[in-house]
Amino acid sequence: MPIGVPKVPFRSPGEEDAVWVDVYNRLHRERLLFLGQEVDSEISNQLVGLMVYLSIEDDTRDLYLFINSPGGWVIPGIAIYDTMQFVPPDVHTICMGLAASMGSFILVGGEITKRLAFPHARVMIHQPASSFYEAPTGEFILEAEELLKLRETLTRVYVQRTGNPLWVISEDMERDVFMSATEAQAHGIVDVVAVENTGDFT
């Protein structure tokens, strides 16, 4: 039986009594954001809205985006990435569990020097795939052209943000490339592998 989203007590400044809010609402108030599902338009719009709102509220405090995602749709993922580059606060990205496909693209989009993976996290990069294999031929050709443009965009970002040469990223994107946290660090996707039990996210 599902338990739903856990609730935690929260006391607003100046209020005597605490109110019960869902745990994510409470964490958002501390500027902690979560991508714990496939990337789609709904979660993309939620994260974009939260990043913009929290930036307006205080543009000097960093944001923290925790990622455990198998990937998902390319355009919603690019929307999250672009927003991370646009908002004034630095966005830390933290990989826990898995950051695959668009999950790894969002991970690499964190502020350089502030991208972290938990010790047992996994990262996977590959090229974008089409979901319209049964479309009429004309539509399929247009889809293929668009996919090529998207692949070029993703490749360019990986090259820029990892420091790897174009040929390395191009080869990596030909197939599914899975990495451990330390391999992702060596590859330039994350900057730091978390040390267990430090209790410090800064």
Swiss-Prot record:
Name the Pfam families for this protein. Answer: CLP_protease
List the Gene Ontology MF annotations in alphabetical order.
ATP-dependent peptidase activity; ATPase binding; serine-type endopeptidase activity
Q: Mind telling me which SUPFAM superfamilies this protein's record contains?
A: ClpP/crotonase
EC assignment: the record states 3.4.21.92
Q: What is its main location?
A: plastid
> Which residues does the entry assign to the active site, renumbered to this chain?
101 (nucleophile), 126
Q: Does the keyword Transcription regulation apply?
A: no
Listed GO CC annotations: chloroplast stroma; endopeptidase Clp complex
Q: Where in the cell is it found?
A: Plastid, Chloroplast stroma
Keyword set, alphabetical order: Chloroplast, Hydrolase, Plastid, Protease, Serine protease
PROSITE patterns given in the database record: CLP_PROTEASE_HIS, CLP_PROTEASE_SER
Report the catalytic activity: Hydrolysis of proteins to small peptides in the presence of ATP and magnesium. alpha-casein is the usual test substrate. In the absence of ATP, only oligopeptides shorter than five residues are hydrolyzed (such as succinyl-Leu-Tyr-|-NHMec, and Leu-Tyr-Leu-|-Tyr-Trp, in which cleavage of the -Tyr-|-Leu- and -Tyr-|-Trp bonds also occurs)
Q: Which InterPro entries match?
A: ClpP, ClpP/crotonase-like_dom_sf, ClpP/TepA, ClpP_His_AS, ClpP_Ser_AS
Q: What does this protein do?
A: Cleaves peptides in various proteins in a process that requires ATP hydrolysis. Has a chymotrypsin-like activity. Plays a major role in the degradation of misfolded proteins.
Oligomer status and interactors = Component of the chloroplastic Clp protease core complex.
Q: What is this protein called?
A: ATP-dependent Clp protease proteolytic subunit
